[in-house]
A protein has these predicted regions:
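Short amphipathic alpha-helix segments
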Residues: 29, 102-109, 190-199
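Leucine-rich, highly hydrophobic segment in Treponema pallidum outer-membrane-associated proteins
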Residues: 1-100, 116-119, 202-206, 210, ...
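C-terminal/domain-terminus segments
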Residues: 105-107, 236-242, 322-324
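C-terminal low-complexity, acidic/polar tails when present
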Residues: 98-126
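Well-ordered, non-membrane alpha-helical segments in soluble/globular domains
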Residues: 67-68, 102-110, 146-154
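Beta-strand-rich interaction surfaces with strong enrichment in secreted/lumenal proteins
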Residues: 74-75, 108, 168-170
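Single conserved position on a long alpha-helix in the C-terminal lobe of the eukaryotic protein kinase
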Residues: 1-4, 115-246
Length: 324
């Protein structure tokens, strides 16, 4: 029966009655990315006599032999003020296998990517430019590989540039090594005039894509400002998300409705210029903006788990939604 396929027992009269139950597998929630978080099995929402309750399911230990659920390094690196954040456990071998399609040196990364990883979106940035934080625990030789992969694979074809791509700038900032490349894009954050070599860009806008590594922390974003802010958070010169996130329990999710509403509002208005898309612009103003205004009035929340250790398959863990 379907209950057994989700690790659930048959309902009986003796058990606490469940009026409604929604169970979603990670195969659906992952949108094809579930292989990146093999420890995640699914989510469940139940309505009983005392209201709604939610649960998160883990796969068995074989799906994530060396996954880490310690997300403290992620929250230490993320600058405060995020609109939405998610942290996930990393399992060895997943990223290395993916990198094998773009680099012959992926085998040298084995065991170097470690711990948890996280993504955060910020209201003053863009929807397509979140900040990624990961953990790198490799040798001195392996520490050179992220920069090589960045140089080989990050960029756009710039036919006006002598080498067909704009150069990568590599700088040292304190203990951090930083790689940056300007990349043409019609959706870029900066106008062409602000580029180091504007005559070589193929678009009127560009991203200043950045990768940084400081000690064991990897930072990446299409928005260079977010990487700079994260370095400041690491160096204790800017507040970090760890100052906001509760320290008791495991926190894989942070939601700031006010920041989310502002980010979505900015993205909507940017993609629907009033003079070019008057019909959709008016529809957004009438139907979407009131809902975003209502969203912005909601409190901030974190998803909190008391413990998170893979055991048997479909291990259901109760979720606490804690307001901040």
């Amino acid at each position: 029966r379907w209950q057994a396929s989700f690790g659930l027992e048959e309902r009986t009269a003796e058990k606490t009655p469940v009026r409604q139950r929604i169970v979603v597998s990670a195969r659906l929630l992952g949108f094809g990315y579930q292989r990146l978080v093999p420890s995640f099995a699914g989510m469940r929402f139940e309505m009983g006599n005392d209201g709604w309750h939610s649960f998160l399911a883990l796969n068995d230990e074989s799906a994530s032999v060396d996954a880490s659920f310690d997300f403290t390094p992620v929250w230490n690196s993320m600058p405060a003020g995020a609109s939405f954040c998610v942290a996930v456990p990393y399992s060895h071998g997943i990223a290395e296998e993916m990198l094998s399609h773009i680099s012959q040196e992926n085998d040298k990364l084995n065991g170097a990517l470690d711990g948890g990883a996280g993504l955060c979106w910020y209201e003053d940035s863009k929807l397509q430019t979140p900040l990624f934080v990961g953990q790198f625990d490799g040798t001195a030789e392996q520490a050179q590989l992220p920069g090589k992969l960045f140089t080989q694979n990050i960029g756009a074809h710039e036919s006006k540039a002598p080498e067909g791509v704009l150069p990568v700038s590599q700088t040292q900032q304190g203990e951090a090594q930083i790689w940056r490349r300007e990349v043409s894009s019609r959706y870029g954050q900066y106008p062409k005039a602000q580029a180091a070599q504007p005559d070589q860009l193929m678009s009127d806008y560009f991203f200043r894509v950045s990768l940084a590594m400081q000690n064991k922390t990897l930072l990446f974003s299409l928005d260079d400002t977010l990487v700079n802010n994260a370095l400041q958070a690491l160096n204790k010169t800017r507040p970090a998300m760890v100052d906001v996130i509760p320290t008791d329990g495991i926190v894989p999710l942070y939601i700031n409705p006010q920041g989310m509403a502002k980010l979505l509002r900015n993205e909507t208005l940017t993609s629907l210029p009033k003079n070019l898309e008057p019909v959709f612009y008016n529809a957004a103003q009438t139907l979407l903006m009131p809902k975003l205004d209502a969203l912005s009035q909601q409190p901030r929340y974190v998803m909190k788990l008391a413990q998170m250790e893979p055991g048997a398959a479909w291990q259901w863990l109760p979720i606490t939604w804690q307001p901040l």
